[in-house]
Design a protein with these regions (language model features):
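Conserved SAM-binding loop
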Residues: 127
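A short glycine-rich, Lys/Arg-flanked "PGG" loop and its adjoining helix->strand segment in the class I
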Residues: 181-197, 218-223
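Hydrophobic beta-strand segment of the Class I
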Residues: 122-123
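Short acidic-aromatic active-site loops that bind/stabilize oxyanions
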Residues: 173-181
Length: 411
């Protein structure tokens, strides 16, 4: 029977992660590490050797892997769901359908899919720019599995996994930013064509720098998708609050876009700031989320605002690319920018009944300083009431006259 043999191969393949000369020792936990703790081949100076078949103690033994396979098979035949109640964790009765029933499995390049208006949803995990070279890492398992499967399945005939088809930014394969953006766009085009008009695309993405997010957003929007929702999986609150590069995992939900409207960058920036403010207020009031998670959601909402105007955002008479906008969004959400006090003041003038909270939100991620604005009478606080220093404000007029007459620190 092929099934038991392949189940044994699965267990053996998993046990390879911790039973190889590439496995290191985790001193803090007194056990072996698996080889892909860094998503790379990282040969240790002092490999860790365990009992491959299993003892009372140890990590990643064949016995443990085999037990995991059995648990998986049993779950697939009688899947359930667990949920938390006030009395503890509860488990549902088994579902009416087994995992794997009424399923069609295909192997190949997804860009070869020729479906048209067929799918209600596409749930995927796209390549991560230059973050993880899956084709390189998967060879570790492939070469072992091929010994057993090469005569059974045509996909195991080649000596190694495919390289040229991989959508990555990898200099070793003569693939850079342009190739990644083009090929990722090809994939999104295929998904767009295969979805029904009311279909939905959902995928996870992980990276840290604005360039990779810019490439993703550019390819996604070029394929006529609009970001409609984002959900954080993990984030680093310290990096968000300190303005450092942030690594986070995020679930992105997108749908076919409607007609996109032209907009100036200043107007879009105000929309992004306003949306971020509303998002932050809503999440802090109703949910117990970390600031890092809230920051990720704010970032996603900013992506949504941009995707409604992709290819139509103008600054100084030029159309901004998605990568340029993402750089600015990073500045608004977490870093500094060249937006100064006058820019913030002009943004406040656009708001109905601006408040001190609006000032704080608009200043966030800019080089503007609220104290400098206060010293220049661009705003003032009178008995807790926020007042803008407009042309008809007497104190603002007095400040300007003083500067013009040279009695102050005039220019």
């Amino acid at each position: 029977d092929a099934n038991p043999r392949e189940f044994l191969l699965l267990a053996f393949s998993d046990a390879l992660r911790t039973n190889t000369m590439m496995a290191s020792y985790q001193f803090s936990a007194n056990k072996s590490n698996h080889i892909f703790k860094t998503n790379s081949f990282d040969p240790p100076m002092r490999p860790s050797e365990g009992n491959v078949w299993g003892t009372e103690y140890g990590m990643g033994t064949f016995e443990a892997a085999w037990s995991m396979v059995i648990d998986g098979v049993q779950y697939a035949n009688a899947p359930t769901e667990r949920y938390v109640t006030s009395s503890g964790t509860e488990e549902t009765p088994p579902f009416s359908q087994r995992i794997g029933d009424d399923v069609s499995v295909h192997q190949g390049d997804m860009r070869d899919i020729d479906a048209k208006d067929e799918y209600d949803a596409v749930i995927t995990d796209p390549p991560y720019y230059d973050n993880i070279m899956y084709s390189d890492l998967s060879d570790f398992f492939y070469v072992w599995q091929r010994l057993v499967l090469s005569e059974e399945y045509e996909w195991f005939e080649d000596p190694a996994t495919p390289r040229s088809e991989s959508i990555v930014a990898n200099p070793a394969e003569n693939k850079g930013v342009d190739e990644f953006e083009e090929e990722l766009g090809e994939g999104f085009d295929v998904i767009h064509n295969s979805l029904k008009s009311d279909g939905v695309l959902s995928f996870t993405y992980h990276h840290s720098d604005s360039e990779s997010w810019g490439e993703l957003l550019q390819a996604l929007c070029d394929a006529d998708f609009e970001v409609t929702a984002t959900y954080p999986i993990s984030s680093d609150i310290q990096k968000f609050t300190e303005g450092e590069v942030v690594e986070f995992d995020i679930i992105i939900v997108a749908r076919p876009a409607n007609d996109r409207r032209p907009i100036s960058w200043n107007s879009l920036r105000r929309n992004i700031v306003r949306t971020a403010k509303q998002t932050h207020q809503r999440l802090t009031e109703n949910r117990e989320l970390s600031e890092g998670d809230i920051g990720v959601i704010e970032m996603g909402r900013a992506f949504h605002e941009y995707s409604k105007h992709h290819g139509e955002v103008q600054r100084d008479g030029e159309i901004m690319s998605a990568k340029e906008v993402v750089d600015e969004i990073y500045g608004i959400i977490q870093q500094g920018s060249d937006i100064g006090e006058v820019d913030v003041f002009l943004d406040l003038l656009e708001l109905d009944n601006p408040s001190y909270n609006d000032l704080n939100m608009l200043i966030r991620g800019t080089s503007a300083n609220s104290e400098t604005m206060k010293d220049n009478f661009l705003y003032r606080m009178d008995a807790g009431e926020f007042t803008l220093g407009t042309w008809d404000d007497e104190k603002r007029q007095a400040f300007i006259h003083e500067r013009v007459d040279g009695d102050g620190d005039g220019e």
